[in-house]
Amino acid sequence: DFPALCLDNPVAYLDNACVTLRPHSVINAISDYYVHSPGCGGRSVHRYGTAVSKTIANSRKTLAGFFNAPSVNEVIFTRNATHSLNQVAKGLHWSKGDVVLTTDREHNSNLVPWLQLEEEQGIDHRVVPSNADNTFDLEAFEAMCADAGNRLRMVSVSQVGNLDGVETPIREITKI
């Protein structure tokens, strides 16, 4: 399904926060858009713009159902994970001393925004260390959450490491 993986000497590609490989179905849909619907959704009232607006509304509805979102208004589209993380980091109101937890295995997309906010606004960015086997240290995470107390504003972790493919136990993290 992924043409980039069918080339000579394919790679194990894990850098999806930057650019995700696209399957044929996505490539074909993008090509179809440029041929049949080259309009601006939500802005244009001509045939192309109206078609794009309907497609976006239907996509939002489908995704809201998939993610069990209470409203289609909670579904937004961004360019990529980097853009999304920057929107969250820069879009929230932060107070000096607010704690943000990340891991020691984060992609720069999930590290740089917090380092910038630490410098610019005085948030307290803390890094959860990995275990010796490079897995997520749930005990250290729980202790760091307890230490932060009510100053903990954000836990921002990658589900899978882009360099090594090691999974972060998201379900367990959400229970803490």
Residue ranges and their predicted role:
Residues 1-176:
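Pyridoxal 5′-phosphate
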